[in-house]
Each structure stands twice: as C-alpha cells, then as structure tokens.
UniProtKB/Swiss-Prot annotation:
The active site is at 178 (proton acceptor). It comes from Methylibium petroleiphilum (strain ATCC BAA-1232 / LMG 22953 / PM1). S-adenosyl-L-methionine binds at residues 64, 66, 97, 113, 138. Belongs to the class I-like SAM-binding methyltransferase superfamily. RNA methyltransferase RlmE family. Pfam families: FtsJ (PF01728). GO terms for cellular component: cytoplasm. Keywords: Cytoplasm, Methyltransferase, rRNA processing, S-adenosyl-L-methionine, Transferase. It is found in: Cytoplasm. This is Ribosomal RNA large subunit methyltransferase E. The keyword Transferase applies. One of its GO terms (molecular function) is rRNA (uridine-2'-O-)-methyltransferase activity. Its EC number is 2.1.1.166. The gene is rlmE. SUPFAM superfamilies: S-adenosyl-L-methionine-dependent methyltransferases.
Length: 224
C-alpha cells in the first residue's frame, strides 16, 4: 500500500493553484514568459516609473518576463505582437542574471553573478556614461529554510542592489526591489529611507497571497 507523502500533496496543491492562477492564464494569453510580468506592470501603473526613452537595468532577469514588459513599454504600438515585442525600440534595456534565457529583441543580456566584481564591471561598461533611469530587481537567493541564513542572503542582495542604484541612477531615478516580510524587513525599509527621498512599499495583486514577497520602491536619491 502506497502512502502519499506530505511533499507530494504540497506539490500537487501548488500545481493546481498554478494551473488555475488567473495571472498564469493571462501571461500565456499575452505572450509573457512568467506571471511575474504583472507584478512590475502593477507597480509601474501605480507609480508611473517606466517611460519611453529611458535606460533601465533589469537585475535577476530570468526568464525574461520583466524585460518583456519593459520592451513593450518602450514600443507600445507593438504590445500585441508576442513575448519579444518587435518594432522600433525607444529606450534601452540591460538585463542581468546568473541563468541564461531566450533572447529578447532589443534587450542586452549579461549572464553572470551579481556578487562578482568582474560581472559588475561588465554591467557598468554596458551602461556607459549615460546613467540609468530605473533599476528593477527581482533577485532572490536560493533559500535554505533556515530563517537567519535566508534573511542574511536576502538582505545582501537588496543591499547590493541599493549600492548599484546609488552608483548608476540619475538623481531622480528609481529602484524597484523584491524583498520578503520577516526578519530583517524593517531594516531594509530603513535602508531605503536613508537612501531615497520617497519610499513606497508595494505588494502587487499578482504576488500570491500566501507569499511573503513584497517590493520596495525608492524614488529620488538623497545627497550623501
């Protein structure tokens, strides 16, 4: 007699939720690679961050859904042409991730570890002297299940994203950064408040209710 394990039950429940998720269905219909596109879309529509003609850096970009959304924002007349929107691109997108993903027309992709100084140097070279209007970060570490260790890993990625933004953003630029509620969250909010003139915590509707995932948006760098 076979007994179903708890993990199998959990996996089946997750799969059922995923299949029936309205954002998963919408992503499939509209040609996005992942439902995550709607998280950035909701943040952008609420705050008006992304505009044609900008330079945007997408950190933790794989599988490319956020870059797809950015691509469509920079070519709005081509929004219905599929995942890798075609047409004239009014803006620049530089994407970075440890994992590779299928190319998106007009998106410059750098594969590498954000912790690696050589990779950061390559990213800085790609940006050049123009500076960046918006940095979006969907980076998340591989979680171990050990709360203290996971909190430290999450905090490090957020701190690195803030440091990168301080180096490359225009004074009125913005940083969108994924964080998680739990140990260390209040310290990350304080970090944003120290570095940005306006700080907006947002949990998009596309973020699952059961998830501790949320986003911090910092707008306008403070003078240091």
């Amino acid at each position: 007699m076979k007994v179903k394990t708890k993990s199998k039950k959990v996996n089946k429940a997750w799969l059922n939720d995923h299949i029936n998720d309205p954002y998963v269905k919408l992503a499939q219909k509209e040609g996005y690679r992942a439902r995550a596109a709607y998280k950035l879309k909701e943040i952008d529509e609420a705050l008006g961050l992304i505009k044609p003609g900008q330079v945007v850096v997408d950190l933790g970009a794989a599988p490319g859904a956020w870059s797809q959304y950015l691509r469509r924002r920079f070519a709005p007349k081509e929004a219905g042409t599929g995942g890798a929107a075609a047409g004239a691109l009014n803006g620049r997108i530089i994407a970075l991730d440890l994992l590779d993903f299928e190319p998106i027309e007009g998106v410059q992709f750098i594969q590498g570890d954000f912790h690696d100084e050589a990779v950061l140097a390559e990213l800085s070279a790609a940006i050049g002297g123009r500076g960046v209007d918006v940095v979006v970060s969907d980076m998340a570490p591989n979680l171990s299940g050990i709360a203290s260790s996971d909190s430290a890993r999450i905090a490090l990625l957020v701190e690195l994203a803030v440091e990168f933004a301080e180096t490359h953003l225009h004074p009125h630029g913005a940083l969108v950064c994924k964080v998680f509620h739990g140990s260390g969250h209040s310290q990350l909010v304080e970090l944003f408040k120290k570095r940005f003139r306006v700080v907006k915590p947002i949990k998009p509707k596309a973020s699952r209710d059961k998830s501790s995932e949320t986003f911090l948006v910092g707008i306008g760098l403070k003078s240091r």
